[in-house]
Amino acid sequence: MYWFRRKYRQIQRVIDFFPLIWKGFDFDYQYAVDLFKKQLERTANHLESERAITLSAPIKVQKIRTAIRLMDKVYEEEYAHEYIDKIKELYGENTLDWWFEDTGKGNDSSYLRYEYEKWDNADEINEMKRKLFKESIDKQKRAHKLLWDFIEHNIQRWWD
């Protein structure tokens, strides 16, 4: 009987992972992160189920779900893009509207131009954009480090 239950669970597992594996590529680490995240979700779901054995399962689930939320924030680059919202809040929604301008060299090359470059306070906006961009990137790096430090600190306890 155990053999049949085990095979059934293995087939379910293959079906569950199949879409993720199908769309994956070997040249991008993001797919490895997605696979790891999927496994963390499965582990959390197991620990929330009636099949969980340990009494500390709810605490483990909470930590796993925290790691998953952090992964979403880090790998969707939520912090890296904060500067865009801040610039728009300070200077207006269309500040960072952009277009390509032909260089005139006849080789299909172009410059990236921003709406604010036509404004009187373009230098101020550019300086603020650089400052806020650096802050956003630094925050993104800290979040990335925090995520993996959190996982390293907790992962060996995430089992049933």
Mark where each language-model region is.
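Long, non-globular targeting/processing and low-complexity regions
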Residues: 1-154
